[in-house]
Amino acid sequence: RHLHRDEARLAAVLDVALNDADANLHVAALHLLAESDQQTAMDWIKRDLEQDSITRRQGAIALLGTLDDPEAVRVLTELHAEMAGQLPMALHLDVHDAIAKRSERSMELLAALHTDGHYSAALVGGDADRGRSLVRYHAAAACLRCHMIDGHGGTSAPDLTDAHERLDRAALLQSIIEPTAVVAEGYGDVTAMPEMIQHLTPRQVRDIVEYLAQPSGGDQE
């Protein structure tokens, strides 16, 4: 009896969260729902994919890469086909990432996209706040060991404070994926920046691009 009561309480909480206007709360609830009811989760996914919210659509696509459901594969295949036309660029990396999850080749996929010149997959759709945390605190990437941002960090590599004024998104992405392709004036080979695909997931790369593409004036400690 207690178990049924707890399940009913959880279902009620999920229902409220799924219908909340906060996209992040909705996505979190959808992922919880998928753990117990994949069919209902698929119904929500299909609805979310028709929404204007990029966050909700990204969350739905991410879930497609984890569900053990033939319908999830079908929808994901359709989304992949739409990448050649109407699918917003901000969702392209999410589709690739969801597909890659099924074959466990996510980073190899991003490298392949880069090699093919498909920079657009990680150009837009990132989260600037997550990107800020990655740039400042990711242990393996260690951006601030060499770069300075808003007066914090090293000086052996270009200052990233106003990177958005010097580089467009494609150049920012290239500097992460292929850092030795363009050497900043005055630094030569001293930077010796490692290729970040060794340390970052595709989504993290996209978040960093989004962060660096923003004006730094609103970046507060």
Region roles according to the model:
Residues 22-24, 54-55, 85-89:
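Alpha-helix N-cap/helix-start positions at coil->helix boundaries
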Residues 111-138, 216-221:
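Electrostatic cytochrome c docking/interface patches
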Residues 131, 139-150, 160, 193, ...:
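The canonical Cys-X-X-Cys-His
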Residues 3-7, 33-37, 64-68, 84, ...:
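Alpha-solenoid repeat junctions
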Residues 5-17, 27, 38-50, 58, ...:
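Amphipathic alpha-helical scaffolding segments comprising HEAT/armadillo-like alpha-solenoid repeats
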Residues 29, 60, 92-95:
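Conserved hydrophobic register position within alpha-solenoid helical repeats
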Residues 136, 145-152, 165, 177, ...:
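Detector for the c-type heme attachment site
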Residues 80-83, 90-99, 154-163, 179-206:
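Axial heme c-ligation environment in periplasmic c-type cytochrome domains
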